Regions:
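Catalytic domains of carbohydrate-active enzymes, especially glycoside hydrolases
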Residues: 1, 43, 47-52, 194-203
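Short, solvent-exposed turn/loop segments enriched in Gly/Ser/Thr/Pro and often Arg
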Residues: 4-9, 208-212
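Active-site-adjacent "subsite" loops/lids of carbohydrate-active enzymes
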Residues: 5-42, 159-165
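Short acidic, gly/pro-rich beta-turn/loop elements at beta-sheet edges
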Residues: 10-19, 67, 117, 148, ...
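Glycine- and acidic
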Residues: 22-27, 64-74, 169-178
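Structured mid-domain segments that build the active-site/substrate or prosthetic-cofactor binding neighborhood
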Residues: 140-144, 151-320
Length: 326
């Protein structure tokens, strides 16, 4: 389950069962309704234990929000999560396997949860807590495709290892980017190969939103995870080779080699433009109409992409039409 849906239960699921007469209680709060929330988690573990699972640990507030209010201290949050983890581990022992080392578990150190993990000079965080032994620590990017933290050499022996939660699509502030695949492959390569070198190798998750138009970036993310030796390479230029092979894989037999080269160019340049500025943050003042030829270069590049795509639109075979549009 996702980063904010612990013990195999979707957050929205609680809203379907909550109420004054529900055995789960009527508050998504481990402070005021610990018995109801515990029972809710127990039933989720029982329901899913026959399947292959990676159980999400921890807890966030309703609808993927902060678990406690703004008036609560860092210590309040950390103490609550310690208790949550203790209860969840005991539930897993009772319902799944008494040997926790045999149960795949993860906790996603996302947004404010990252602060709860590290703590500060006055308040020890969850780092090193025995309740996290055997739990994969899922680090995250900054919602915009840049990793926030990577494990230090001292941290890399954590039992349970490390994972990465990476955004190719993001709904939220300060600005969202959705619907259009805009992940720049060289940056994706840079961030994920660095994560791999720092020992983040147990779980990779990407928030992809809708798969349509994301196939290119998602394919590279998965292929890189599957075969780091092949696609890790020595520098980001290997993403150019990947693009060539990916275009060939999608359209081989539908277009000539010369035509495939033009389609590769269009996809690469389009991806590069989006790396500079995504659709959601584009406006008339981004590219200067005079200095450094910024606006002119973007216009010429855009016109070339449109020319290539329009040129082959009408000759694309029907069985490849869906792939061509995406």
């Amino acid at each position: 389950t996702s980063h904010h849906e612990p013990c195999m239960r979707a957050g929205a699921e609680y809203g379907l069962f909550r109420g004054p007469d529900s055995k789960y209680g009527d508050a998504w709060s481990f402070l005021t309704n610990p018995e109801g929330i515990t029972e809710f988690w127990r039933d989720g573990l029982l329901r899913n234990r026959q399947f292959e699972n990676v159980i999400t640990m921890g807890m966030r507030g309703e609808n993927d929000t902060a678990i406690l209010g703004a008036d609560c201290t860092l210590k309040d949050n950390i103490d609550l999560l310690r208790q949550v983890l203790k209860v969840q581990n005991q539930l897993i022992r009772e319902t799944v396997n008494e040997d926790l080392s045999k149960v795949p578990r993860q906790i996603v150190l996302f947004t404010e949860v990252e602060e709860f993990f590290y703590g500060n000079q006055d308040t020890p965080g969850l780092i090193g807590d025995p309740e996290l032994d055997g739990v994969t620590l899922m680090l995250s990017d900054n919602n915009q495709g840049s990793t926030r933290t990577l494990p230090s050499e001292k941290m890399r022996n954590h039992p349970g290892g490390y994972g990465m939660y990476y955004h190719m699509d993001m709904h939220g502030g300060p600005h969202a980017f959705e619907w259009i695949g805009s992940t720049y492959l060289p940056k994706l390569w840079e961030q994920m190969t660095a994560a791999y070198e720092y020992g983040v190798r147990d779980i990779w998750v990407t928030n992809v939103g809708d798969i349509g138009t994301q196939e290119y970036g998602l394919s590279f993310f998965l292929d890189l995870a599957y075969d780091m030796e092949k696609w890790g390479g020595t520098d980001a230029a290997i993403t150019k080779q990947y693009t060539k092979e990916w275009i060939s894989k999608q359209f081989r037999g539908a277009f000539t080699e010369e035509q495939l080269e033009e389609l590769e160019k269009a996809l690469w340049e389009y991806n590069r433009l989006l790396a500079r500025r995504k659709h959601e943050t584009m406006n008339a003042d981004v590219y200067h109409p005079v200095h450094f030829g910024e606006a002119q270069e973007v216009l010429e590049c855009s016109e070339e992409i449109i020319r290539i795509c329009g040129k082959y639109k009408n000759i694309c075979p029907k069985h490849k039409w869906g792939a061509y549009i995406s």
